[in-house]
């Protein structure tokens, strides 16, 4: 009980297990911290699951909802569906819970998660949730789950050429339905998806205007997922415009907004946003370590959006001119994920492979992939993958293959190249200068001093050292000492 009061829930479960207090263990796993408890120590849950089974079905059925939610975000849908069907069957045959509409509504939310490859089915499931819930809202699921698919939500749901507008409209319905059952704000979602459509189809001015509008609408609403996604579009637009100072101001504001986030899904999403735009600029040292080193396990498990991680690493390989690795990344992006196709990453994969094959001297293959990319893009006018890779793609268009679609992209590519060049015009592209004290502090950091030693050398409190280090990291757009030192050396 002491451990529980101290919020040391894993210890509490261990002690309750020794005491064979299965009722209290079930209550912990059913409570508001149950899902996080399972996420932190799934093995412990499995070790007590059989013992709490009886009391769970008597009093705490939400234990299985929390476990099912955990499994739905960690495992392949085909591995989770048998468990889902088993639990649904248990509920339907249980004398207490079979007529509990609220419990069935929560199960339908989980079903919508498992249907993430089919937006139409997801919307149908959420309609049933409303029928079960009435005016009530989910007590289990937070609105940050909507971040599935962002940084570019359409990356996940756009699964057939010629259906982009239709998918955008379905996304609007899904977002509003999900917000309704999770007490989230419904403000701005229509405009957000309109901005995403504009971005994908190259209407940069409209994308920028709408993304800023939605950001302002939600900045005070604690609607973190839509804020992060708006910054993704805004920062990409600022690169296109070549607005360096506004870009770094945007990065700093995003850092301020997300600094205290603890939810893994949102942390990964924010790191994806910054990672991609930094990769576009070739600023590897500012990217999170897992993106720099192509370790995408968490990206895949947390938001089922491994393609965004691949696109980011591909951009980095373009900058580093590692054509063999770029070709491998492009190939991976073209492999169906969870038995479905994702058109936007597939197009980008074709573009990556066209660039890679051209630079490795295989013009026949380069032509095949660029034609494939155009074929998939033409009906919906998907042009952003070509624009953002225009610097490397330009010689392919000039020397291997072109057509009316590609010719129409040349003004966009020229504008994007100019934007990139404005960022690289001055070697020191960090507009935030360190103070005299911060410079002195960083000299000690580079020399290998510990924080306590720096405190003694500079005659300042340890907490002041830590505060100044945090300020330096923020100004440089990095997260640790090693990256800060690399930035200063550069």
What spans do the regions from the language model cover?
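General nucleic-acid-binding
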Residues: 350-419
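Alpha-solenoid helical repeat architecture
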Residues: 22-23, 60, 96-106, 136-153, ...
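Structural register within alpha-helical repeat arrays
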Residues: 11-12, 32, 67, 111, ...
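Internal alpha-solenoid helical repeat scaffolds
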Residues: 56-229
């Amino acid at each position: 009980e002491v451990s529980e009061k101290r919020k040391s829930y894993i210890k509490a479960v261990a002690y309750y297990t020794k005491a064979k207090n299965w009722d209290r263990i079930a209550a912990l796993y059913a409570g508001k911290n149950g899902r996080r408890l399972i996420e932190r120590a799934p093995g412990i849950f499995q070790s007590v699951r059989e013992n709490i089974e009886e009391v769970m079905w008597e009093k705490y059925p939400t234990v299985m909802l929390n476990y099912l939610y955990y499994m739905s975000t960690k495992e392949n849908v085909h591995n989770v569906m048998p468990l889902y069907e088993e639990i649904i069957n248990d509920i339907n045959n249980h004398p207490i819970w079979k007529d509990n509409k609220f419990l069935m509504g929560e199960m339908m939310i989980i079903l919508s998660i498992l249907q993430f490859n089919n937006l139409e089915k997801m919307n149908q499931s959420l309609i049933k949730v409303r029928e079960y819930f009435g005016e009530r809202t989910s007590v289990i699921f937070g609105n940050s789950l909507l971040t599935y698919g962002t940084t570019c939500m359409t990356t996940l749901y756009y699964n057939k050429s010629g259906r982009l507008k239709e998918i955008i409209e379905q996304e609007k319905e899904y977002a509003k339905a999900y917000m309704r059952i999770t007490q989230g704000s419904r403000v701005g979602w229509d405009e957000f998806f309109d901005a995403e459509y504009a971005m994908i189809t190259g209407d940069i001015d409209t994308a920028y205007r709408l993304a800023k509008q939605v950001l302002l609408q939600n900045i005070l609403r604690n609607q973190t997922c839509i804020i992060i996604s708006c910054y993704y579009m805004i920062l990409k637009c600022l690169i296109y415009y070549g607005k360096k100072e506004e870009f770094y101001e945007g990065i700093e504001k995003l850092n301020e907004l997300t600094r205290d986030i603890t939810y893994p899904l949102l942390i990964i999403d924010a790191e994806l946003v910054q990672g991609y735009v930094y990769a576009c600029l070739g600023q590897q040292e500012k990217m999170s370590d897992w993106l720099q080193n192509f370790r995408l396990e968490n990206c895949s498990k947390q938001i089922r959006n491994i393609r965004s991680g691949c696109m980011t690493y591909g951009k980095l390989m373009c900058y580093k001119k590692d054509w063999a690795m770029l070709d491998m990344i492009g190939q991976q992006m073209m492999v169906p994920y969870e038995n479905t196709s994702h058109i936007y990453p597939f197009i980008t994969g074709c573009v990556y492979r066209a660039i890679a094959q051209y630079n490795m001297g295989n013009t026949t293959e380069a032509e095949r992939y660029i034609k494939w990319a155009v074929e998939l893009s033409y009906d919906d006018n998907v042009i952003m993958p070509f624009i953002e890779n225009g610097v490397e793609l330009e010689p392919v268009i000039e020397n291997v293959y072109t057509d009316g679609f590609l010719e129409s992209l040349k003004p966009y590519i020229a504008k994007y190249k100019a934007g990139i060049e404005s960022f690289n015009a001055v070697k020191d592209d960090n507009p935030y200068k360190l103070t005299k004290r911060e410079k002195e502090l960083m000299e000690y950091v580079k020399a290998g001093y510990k924080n306590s030693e720096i405190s003694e050398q500079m005659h300042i409190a340890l907490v002041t050292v830590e505060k100044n280090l945090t300020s330096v990291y923020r100004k440089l757009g990095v997260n640790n000492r090693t990256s800060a030192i690399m930035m200063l050396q550069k």
